[in-house]
Amino acid sequence: MGIRAFRPYTPGTRERVVSDYAEITRNEPEKSLLVSKHRRKGRNNRGVITCRHRGGGHKRLYRIIDFKRDKRNVPGKIVSIEYDPNRNARISLVYYEDGEKRYILTPAGVHVGTPIIAGDETPIEVGNAMPLQNIPLGTTVHNVELVAGKGGQIVRAAGASAQVVAKEGNYVALKLPSTEVRLVRKECYATIGAVGNAEVRNTSLGKAGRKRWLGRRPEVRGSVMNPVDHPHGGGEGRAPIGRSGPVTPWGKPALGRKTRKKNKQSDRLIQRRRRKSSKRGRGGRDA
């Protein structure tokens, strides 16, 4: 798992840094684990844009990923590591002894032939899944459930990992990638190890066209729009915002405004909030 930088022999390769895909062992996905995927293009059921800057991109087939790891006490073996266009992490095809095939997120450090198993009393090995109550303190985990039996919901991105830091009654404290410490029920399953392909953070698309291939459309600054299109728009030349602070296209405060609802049920499970990112001044990027 490495990255490949290009010489600037064209404008598009000047800043291009991509994965070398050396860990990929199979080009064709398992057909029995593919389903078609309707792309929303940022629209809701009424066709109204609810998420801007989405649309286009290459067609994709969705790979059915086993986030639940509910194949309990049945040994399996990784037979291939594949590319998934729907996520930055790699996926691994697992053959189980009873003949079933499933995809899982590829943990860092596994290879073709690595045995894996999920169950209550399984070895502490990378790729194995078990309840949090049976995982030793200090262990790195990923694909963590928030509701027992629902499947992993957090710590699934490429290179992500959480750490088991404490056990308190019916809960286990996890230190998440955001440095937030959160309590999770001890019956919830998690997978040992970190998600692979951590080098993706060092890649660079290199040109606007590659962003379009991924289904991302251009983002236009509000200050270069007309007043009818954005509160920052209008004026002669490069005019200031004309407000006390930057706002969204709908007039709501942006860039620093807290958006988390008060009195959420999960507040009681968060022992330490995530650390604040670097502060932005009022001269930051337009919303």
UniProtKB/Swiss-Prot annotation:
> What is a biological process (GO) this protein takes part in?
translation
Q: What does this protein do?
A: One of the primary rRNA binding proteins. Required for association of the 30S and 50S subunits to form the 70S ribosome, for tRNA binding and peptide bond formation. It has been suggested to have peptidyltransferase activity; this is somewhat controversial. Makes several contacts with the 16S rRNA in the 70S ribosome.
Ranges of biased composition (kind: Basic residues): 271-287
Q: Which Gene3D superfamilies match?
A: 2.30.30.30, Nucleic acid-binding proteins (2.40.50.140), Ribosomal protein L2, domain 3 (4.10.950.10)
Keywords assigned by UniProt?
A: Ribonucleoprotein, Ribosomal protein, RNA-binding, rRNA-binding
GO cellular component: a single term: large ribosomal subunit
Report if keyword Electron transport is assigned.
no
- SUPFAM superfamilies in the record: Nucleic acid-binding proteins (SSF50249), Translation proteins SH3-like domain (SSF50104)
**Region called Disordered, residue ranges:** 214-287
Q: Does the keyword DNA repair apply?
A: no
Q: Which GO terms describe its molecular function?
A: rRNA binding; structural constituent of ribosome; transferase activity
Record protein name field: Large ribosomal subunit protein uL2
What is annotated about its quaternary structure and interactions? Part of the 50S ribosomal subunit. Forms a bridge to the 30S subunit in the 70S ribosome.
Species of the source: Synechococcus elongatus (strain ATCC 33912 / PCC 7942 / FACHB-805)
Family the UniProt entry places it in: Belongs to the universal ribosomal protein uL2 family.
Q: Name one Pfam family in it.
A: Ribosomal_L2_C
Q: So which domain of life are we looking at? A: Bacteria
